[in-house]
Protein backbone atom coordinates (compact mmCIF):
# COMPACT_ATOMS: atom_id res chain seq x y z
CA UNK A 1 0.00 0.00 0.00
CA UNK A 2 1.53 3.35 -0.98
CA UNK A 3 2.18 6.13 1.50
CA UNK A 4 -0.24 9.02 1.11
CA UNK A 5 0.98 12.47 0.18
CA UNK A 6 1.67 14.77 3.16
CA UNK A 7 -1.12 17.07 1.98
CA UNK A 8 -3.64 14.27 2.49
CA UNK A 9 -2.44 13.67 6.03
CA UNK A 10 -2.63 17.42 6.62
CA UNK A 11 -6.29 17.47 5.54
CA UNK A 12 -7.20 14.45 7.64
CA UNK A 13 -5.10 15.12 10.74
CA UNK A 14 -2.39 17.76 10.98
CA UNK A 15 -4.41 20.77 9.85
CA UNK A 16 -7.93 19.48 10.52
CA UNK A 17 -9.72 21.10 13.42
CA UNK A 18 -12.81 20.49 15.50
CA UNK A 19 -15.39 23.08 14.45
CA UNK A 20 -18.00 24.79 16.60
CA UNK A 21 -19.21 27.55 14.24
CA UNK A 22 -20.69 26.68 10.87
CA UNK A 23 -21.12 28.41 7.53
CA UNK A 24 -24.62 28.48 6.09
CA UNK A 25 -23.76 25.96 3.37
CA UNK A 26 -25.98 22.88 3.03
CA UNK A 27 -24.75 19.29 2.88
CA UNK A 28 -26.75 17.33 0.34
CA UNK A 29 -28.02 13.81 0.90
CA UNK A 30 -25.90 12.44 -1.95
CA UNK A 31 -22.77 13.41 -0.02
CA UNK A 32 -24.13 11.67 3.08
CA UNK A 33 -24.64 8.52 1.00
CA UNK A 34 -21.06 8.78 -0.24
CA UNK A 35 -19.89 9.29 3.33
CA UNK A 36 -21.62 6.17 4.59
CA UNK A 37 -20.54 4.15 1.56
CA UNK A 38 -16.95 5.02 2.51
CA UNK A 39 -17.27 4.47 6.26
CA UNK A 40 -18.84 1.03 5.86
CA UNK A 41 -15.55 -0.40 4.57
CA UNK A 42 -13.63 0.40 7.76
CA UNK A 43 -12.67 -2.75 9.67
CA UNK A 44 -14.65 -4.01 12.65
CA UNK A 45 -14.44 -7.24 14.64
CA UNK A 46 -15.95 -10.08 12.58
CA UNK A 47 -17.21 -7.45 10.12
CA UNK A 48 -19.90 -6.76 12.71
CA UNK A 49 -20.42 -3.09 11.74
CA UNK A 50 -22.75 -2.34 14.67
CA UNK A 51 -22.78 1.44 14.17
CA UNK A 52 -25.99 3.07 13.02
CA UNK A 53 -26.03 6.68 11.84
CA UNK A 54 -28.92 9.10 12.13
CA UNK A 55 -28.32 12.23 10.04
CA UNK A 56 -30.33 15.00 11.66
CA UNK A 57 -30.94 17.77 9.10
CA UNK A 58 -34.49 19.08 9.26
CA UNK A 59 -35.50 21.91 11.55
CA UNK A 60 -38.08 19.67 13.20
CA UNK A 61 -35.54 16.94 13.96
CA UNK A 62 -33.01 19.52 15.18
CA UNK A 63 -35.61 20.89 17.61
CA UNK A 64 -35.96 17.40 19.03
CA UNK A 65 -32.21 16.95 19.36
CA UNK A 66 -31.13 20.35 20.68
CA UNK A 67 -32.80 19.96 24.12
CA UNK A 68 -30.88 16.69 24.55
CA UNK A 69 -27.56 18.51 24.23
CA UNK A 70 -25.64 20.14 27.06
CA UNK A 71 -25.99 23.92 27.20
CA UNK A 72 -22.65 24.55 25.51
CA UNK A 73 -23.50 22.28 22.59
CA UNK A 74 -27.02 23.47 21.82
CA UNK A 75 -26.37 26.44 19.55
CA UNK A 76 -23.62 24.75 17.54
CA UNK A 77 -25.92 21.77 17.02
CA UNK A 78 -28.77 24.02 15.93
CA UNK A 79 -26.46 25.84 13.49
CA UNK A 80 -24.68 22.85 11.92
CA UNK A 81 -26.09 21.72 8.56
CA UNK A 82 -26.04 18.09 9.73
CA UNK A 83 -25.74 16.49 13.13
CA UNK A 84 -24.99 12.77 13.16
CA UNK A 85 -26.15 10.61 16.02
CA UNK A 86 -23.56 7.83 16.01
CA UNK A 87 -25.40 4.93 17.60
CA UNK A 88 -24.97 1.19 17.94
CA UNK A 89 -27.40 -1.64 17.36
CA UNK A 90 -27.86 -3.88 20.40
CA UNK A 91 -28.99 -6.63 18.02
CA UNK A 92 -26.11 -6.25 15.56
CA UNK A 93 -25.26 -9.94 15.91
CA UNK A 94 -28.45 -10.86 14.04
CA UNK A 95 -26.75 -9.53 10.88
CA UNK A 96 -23.65 -11.70 11.30
CA UNK A 97 -24.90 -14.63 9.18
CA UNK A 98 -24.94 -12.16 6.27
CA UNK A 99 -21.87 -10.10 7.21
CA UNK A 100 -19.56 -12.91 8.41
CA UNK A 101 -21.00 -16.06 6.81
CA UNK A 102 -18.05 -18.44 6.93
CA UNK A 103 -18.46 -19.16 10.67
CA UNK A 104 -21.38 -19.04 13.10
CA UNK A 105 -20.37 -15.70 14.61
CA UNK A 106 -23.91 -15.00 15.79
CA UNK A 107 -23.50 -17.73 18.41
CA UNK A 108 -20.60 -15.81 19.98
CA UNK A 109 -23.06 -13.19 21.18
CA UNK A 110 -26.54 -14.71 21.33
CA UNK A 111 -27.95 -14.54 24.86
CA UNK A 112 -25.02 -12.52 26.27
CA UNK A 113 -26.22 -8.92 26.30
CA UNK A 114 -23.18 -7.66 28.23
CA UNK A 115 -20.87 -9.03 25.53
CA UNK A 116 -23.12 -7.64 22.80
CA UNK A 117 -23.10 -4.17 24.36
CA UNK A 118 -19.33 -4.16 24.89
CA UNK A 119 -18.63 -5.24 21.30
CA UNK A 120 -21.20 -2.83 19.92
CA UNK A 121 -19.74 0.12 21.82
CA UNK A 122 -16.14 -0.71 20.88
CA UNK A 123 -16.80 -1.29 17.20
CA UNK A 124 -19.24 1.60 16.76
CA UNK A 125 -16.59 3.85 18.31
CA UNK A 126 -14.18 2.65 15.62
CA UNK A 127 -16.80 3.38 12.98
CA UNK A 128 -17.44 6.81 14.44
CA UNK A 129 -13.73 7.54 14.06
CA UNK A 130 -13.89 6.38 10.47
CA UNK A 131 -16.82 8.76 9.98
CA UNK A 132 -14.73 11.74 11.08
CA UNK A 133 -11.80 10.82 8.83
CA UNK A 134 -14.01 10.01 5.84
CA UNK A 135 -15.95 13.26 6.28
CA UNK A 136 -12.70 15.22 6.27
CA UNK A 137 -11.55 13.32 3.17
CA UNK A 138 -14.78 14.37 1.45
CA UNK A 139 -14.24 18.03 2.32
CA UNK A 140 -16.48 18.27 5.38
CA UNK A 141 -15.54 19.64 8.77
CA UNK A 142 -16.50 17.83 11.96
CA UNK A 143 -17.41 18.70 15.51
CA UNK A 144 -17.68 15.52 17.61
CA UNK A 145 -19.35 15.95 20.99
CA UNK A 146 -19.89 13.99 24.17
CA UNK A 147 -21.95 16.60 26.01
CA UNK A 148 -25.53 15.34 25.82
CA UNK A 149 -28.13 13.46 27.85
CA UNK A 150 -27.87 9.92 26.48
CA UNK A 151 -31.12 8.77 28.10
CA UNK A 152 -32.96 11.68 26.51
CA UNK A 153 -31.41 11.03 23.08
CA UNK A 154 -32.33 7.36 23.29
CA UNK A 155 -35.88 8.07 24.44
CA UNK A 156 -36.39 10.66 21.70
CA UNK A 157 -34.80 8.93 18.73
CA UNK A 158 -34.67 5.24 19.68
CA UNK A 159 -37.77 4.59 21.79
CA UNK A 160 -37.83 0.86 21.02
CA UNK A 161 -34.45 0.52 22.75
CA UNK A 162 -32.66 -1.42 20.02
CA UNK A 163 -30.29 1.38 19.03
CA UNK A 164 -28.32 3.35 21.63
CA UNK A 165 -26.40 6.59 21.19
CA UNK A 166 -22.60 6.42 21.37
CA UNK A 167 -21.64 10.01 20.52
CA UNK A 168 -22.83 12.92 18.41
CA UNK A 169 -20.98 14.78 15.66
CA UNK A 170 -21.79 17.96 13.79
CA UNK A 171 -20.92 18.01 10.09
CA UNK A 172 -20.71 20.80 7.56
CA UNK A 173 -18.39 23.56 6.45
CA UNK A 174 -16.79 25.21 9.44
CA UNK A 175 -15.99 28.88 9.87
CA UNK A 176 -12.20 28.70 10.02
CA UNK A 177 -12.00 32.23 11.41
CA UNK A 178 -13.68 31.03 14.61
CA UNK A 179 -11.49 28.08 15.56
CA UNK A 180 -9.49 28.32 18.76
CA UNK A 181 -5.70 27.90 18.76
CA UNK A 182 -4.80 24.22 18.61
CA UNK A 183 -4.35 22.61 22.00
CA UNK A 184 -1.21 20.58 22.68
CA UNK A 185 -0.99 16.83 22.16
CA UNK A 186 0.99 14.28 24.11
CA UNK A 187 4.38 13.36 22.70
CA UNK A 188 5.27 9.85 21.57
CA UNK A 189 7.27 9.41 24.77
CA UNK A 190 4.29 10.39 26.91
CA UNK A 191 1.71 8.26 25.13
CA UNK A 192 3.50 5.25 23.68
CA UNK A 193 5.60 2.26 24.62
CA UNK A 194 7.62 0.08 22.27
CA UNK A 195 8.19 -3.34 23.81
Swiss-Prot record:
Keyword terms of this UniProt record: Flavoprotein, FMN, NAD, NADP, Oxidoreductase
CDD domains per the UniProt record, alphabetical: RutE-like
EC number: 1.-.-.-
Keyword set includes Hydrolase: no
UniProt-recorded Gene Ontology molecular function terms: oxidoreductase activity
Keyword Oxidoreductase included in the entry's annotation: yes
Named cofactor requirement(s): FMN
NCBIfam families linked to this entry: PRK05365.1
Stated family: Belongs to the nitroreductase family. HadB/RutE subfamily.
Name of the protein in its database record: Putative NADH dehydrogenase/NAD(P)H nitroreductase RSc1004
Species of the source: Ralstonia nicotianae (strain ATCC BAA-1114 / GMI1000)
Amino acid sequence: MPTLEPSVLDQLFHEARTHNVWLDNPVDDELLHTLYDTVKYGPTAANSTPARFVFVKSAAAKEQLVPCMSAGNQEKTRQAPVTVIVAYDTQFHEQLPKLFPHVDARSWYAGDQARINAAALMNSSLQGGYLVIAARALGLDCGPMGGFDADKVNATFFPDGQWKVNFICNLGYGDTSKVHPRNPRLTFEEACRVL
